[in-house]
Amino acid sequence: MGQKIHPTGFRLAVSRNWASRWYAGNSNFATMLNEDLKVRAYLKTKLKNASVGRVVIERPAKNARITIYSSRPGVVIGKKGEDIEVLKSALTKMMGVPVHVNIEEIRKPETDAQLIADSIAQQLEKRIMFRRAMKRAMQNAMRLGAQGIKIMSSGRLNGIEIARKEWYREGRVPLHTLRADIDYGFGEAETTYGIIGIKVWVYKGDRLANGEAPVIDVASDDDKKRRGPRRDDGKPSGRPRAPRPEGQPGAAAPGSAPAAKRVRAKKPDGAVDAAVSAEKAGE
């Protein structure tokens, strides 16, 4: 049966880029990858209320650069930049190299898949109905320019004993199209009944690796298939019939009147009864 591949990994080097951009040899790769995982887990816990969409980690020569995309950059920076300095010192101690932290603002948080998933998870933890939270998020995303959105929740929805899945979709979400810009996000809501998982797919249009929209050839009117003649009832007819040549049976002579239609005479009811009675008498 078909499975849903991760949309970001499916489009790497086509219309998406890596979230960790560095190179390491075989001896240092595992150590640096473990550092990245620790940094992401720390930022997720530290900046839980800052609406962080994604984190990009780059490692130039003997230092590191971390870019945090957030819809609330003021919460990350703090009053007079105090929080950002504390964050920078903690990351430097964790990674062992000087760290530069950049903050990028997300202009439309309603169309960011990760922020939508986190928002729905927070609402579910506050005992808000999952259908209401999902439909409200879909309406806000479509209103602000998304061409399609799909949201799926799975777990003990509304506290039922048997876990199930429910999903809603609005617009187009072409997951098989590589040039489609699909933003994917995942979140978890820790409720009293258990963990509920939220997956969000947002379709923002088509784009290529350089950020440009692809050029789609539109067929001209001459290239389109012409339709056949129409019937009297208004429906298009199929293959046009060729006229019969002269001299063949069924072909009318030129200039002659149309042949009269044969009509079989119907016997009266009395004659039929008389014939039946005569047959019985003969027997």
From Swiss-Prot:
Described purpose of this protein according to its UniProt entry: Binds the lower part of the 30S subunit head. Binds mRNA in the 70S ribosome, positioning it for translation.
UniProt cross-references to Pfam families, sorted A to Z: KH_2, Ribosomal_S3_C
Family matches, as SMART domains: KH
Protein name: Small ribosomal subunit protein uS3
Annotated region described as Disordered, given as residue ranges: 219-283
GO MF entry, a single one: structural constituent of ribosome
Swiss-Prot/TrEMBL keywords: Ribonucleoprotein, Ribosomal protein, RNA-binding, rRNA-binding
Classification via InterPro entries: KH_dom (IPR004087), KH_dom-like_a/b (IPR015946), KH_dom_type_2 (IPR004044), KH_sf_prok-type (IPR009019), Ribosomal_S3_C_sf (IPR036419), Ribosomal_uS3_bac-typ (IPR005704), Ribosomal_uS3_C (IPR001351), Ribosomal_uS3_CS (IPR018280)
Family: Belongs to the universal ribosomal protein uS3 family.
GO cellular component, one term: cytosolic small ribosomal subunit
Basic and acidic residues composition-biased segments: 221-236
Bias (Low complexity) ranges: 237-260
Single biological process term from Gene Ontology: translation
Domain KH type-2: from-to ranges: 39-107
Taxonomic placement: Bacteria, Pseudomonadati, Pseudomonadota, Betaproteobacteria, Burkholderiales
GN (gene name): rpsC
Quaternary structure and interacting proteins, as annotated: Part of the 30S ribosomal subunit. Forms a tight complex with proteins S10 and S14.
